[in-house]
Each structure stands twice: as structure tokens, then as C-alpha cells.
């Protein structure tokens, strides 16, 4: 998300992907940053209708990156999700002096917490100790809708994950994209991918904000 770093990457011919930390959620912001990058990771808070509207504007207005090609949309498809608004969380920086916007998030939100009333110090009854830790994102069951919305690059969690996790998740989503392109994406295949994805580490799954 550093303009100087993006400019330098452009000068040496390095492809740039705009991070979700930029919180790009509308066409005007995208048009500004398109001069630096060929791929944009839109804000995680967008639903597929909003993503599709941005995609339509990319095509309509011919919004292109440094390579002269239409800028491609990248979206999170699987894995851990931040509990905060994209690019706006400073919890890790405040507590550990490690900035999430510099790729150094210490995931303070994943820890277990007890909640106390500030005045009385009475502990509140909270169902789950992990009060800031959301479930993991899984989109393979509506991958076809993401493709239809204009998503062309799928972002899979890999940081701090073991090789088996990375291999299996990548394999499943690669098969799903191939099935979509070949016209063979169906519920039977989705059920198989779902079962395989549940074998590796997860915190339970949800659809993110995509389906509204």
C-alpha cells in the first residue's frame, strides 16, 4: 500500500497487486491506483453485487494497469479473515508495535479473552472466549458466482500454514476453477471439495460478506 514502493516496482517491471489494506471499495479509488497495478484486491467487506458493479465499470471505462491490460480483480477465497475493516485495524501495532498494514500482524484478535465491566470489574458471561476471532472464509461452494461477478484471481491463505494445508487448499480451488471453465462445476463436486477442505486446520467456515 506504499505509493513509493509501488512506483519503484513499476520502474523495474515488477507486477504489483494492490492490497486489501488499501480498502479499495469503489471505482474512483480503483481508477487512482490503477496507474500502479495490474491486479487489485478489493475490500473484503464488499458483496458480490458490489464486486460485479466495479467489474462492469472496469470494462465500461477501460480501466487499465501499467501493462496496458484491463485491471484484474483479486478477492479472498479461503482462510482466515480479519475481524476489522480492511486496512483500519491498529490492534497489533498498538499492542505489539507490529503493523498489520506492513504485513506484520501478530493476530492479537485470535487470542482468548475474558470480558469485565470497567466499573464493577464483574466478569461478563460471554459464550465464546475468542470474542474477536471470526470463522474462516470458504467460497468454493459459490466459486461460480465469484467468477460470474468478475473475480479473476483468488487469494488463498498460506502464511504460517503447513505444506499440507497449502497443497490441499490450492488443489481444491484449482480444480474448482478448472471445473467452472469446463462447464462441469456442480454440487456433487462441491461436496467432495468441502469434505477435503474440512480435513485441514480451520476455525469453522462462513461465506464472508459476499452473499450479503
Give short role names for the model-derived ranges.
Residues 15-17, 31-34, 39-212:
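Surface-exposed amphipathic alpha-helical tracts and adjacent flexible/coil segments at the periphery
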Amino acid at each position: 500500500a506504499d505509493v513509493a514502493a509501488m512506483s519503484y516496482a513499476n520502474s523495474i517491471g515488477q507486477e504489483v497487486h494492490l492490497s486489501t489494506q488499501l480498502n479499495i471499495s469503489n471505482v474512483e479509488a480503483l481508477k487512482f491506483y490503477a496507474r500502479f497495478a495490474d491486479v487489485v484486491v478489493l475490500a473484503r467487506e464488499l458483496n458480490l453485487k458490489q464486486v460485479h458493479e466495479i467489474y462492469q465499470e472496469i470494462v465500461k471505462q477501460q480501466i487499465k494497469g501499467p501493462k496496458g491490460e484491463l485491471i484484474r480483480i483479486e478477492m479472498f477465497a479461503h482462510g482466515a479473515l480479519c475481524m476489522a475493516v480492511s486496512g483500519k485495524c491498529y490492534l497489533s501495532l498498538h499492542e505489539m508495535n507490529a503493523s498489520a498494514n506492513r504485513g506484520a500482524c501478530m493476530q492479537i484478535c485470535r487470542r482468548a479473552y475474558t470480558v469485565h465491566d470497567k466499573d464493577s470489574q464483574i466478569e461478563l458471561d460471554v459464550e465464546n472466549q475468542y470474542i474477536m476471532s471470526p470463522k474462516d472464509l470458504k467460497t468454493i461452494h459459490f466459486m461460480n458466482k465469484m467468477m460470474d461477478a468478475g473475480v479473476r484471481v483468488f487469494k488463498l491463505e498460506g502464511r504460517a500454514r503447513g505444506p499440507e494445508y497449502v497443497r490441499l487448499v490450492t488443489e481444491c480451488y484449482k480444480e474448482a476453477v478448472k471445473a467452472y471453465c469446463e462447464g462441469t462445476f456442480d454440487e456433487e463436486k462441491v461436496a467432495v471439495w468441502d469434505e477435503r477442505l474440512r480435513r485441514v486446520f480451520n476455525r469453522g467456515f462462513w461465506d464472508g460478506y459476499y452473499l450479503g
